[in-house]
């Protein structure tokens, strides 16, 4: 058969389609300007598990950049404003084919609840022959507790574009998978 996987990719391609443009903010119905909903930068945190809905553990981070570079784990965002698309090539580890992708737009640093920056995430490692987990990674349940920068009354005013997050799941099966991610604003103005 024909292999449709790009030659530069280490793993299988995952195509990401971003929708929502932040308008589906669940905390308010406040409208937002185009500059508030724009995606200027994007980090994709990849978690893997043995089964769908299982114990997802951190695998790697992909960051938006000027060029696609699989070795550096960077990707180029195509499109403009809120209509963005991207492709990543996550590392495949035997035994953990189920992936959960957490996308964070317009915020490059994550914090613990007390305001301190998070410690570096620990990547899961599996035995290449058996697929058994040899090194446990940071759990997705812990990752979901992290925060973006806290706004202080005396601090810098809220800037645009606004922080948005979204997530999606897929399984490494064929050469290409498409994941639709709905980004939601995490802050709004009143």
Question: Residues of each region from the PLM?
Answer:
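Sec-type signal peptide cleavage vicinity
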Residues: 1-190
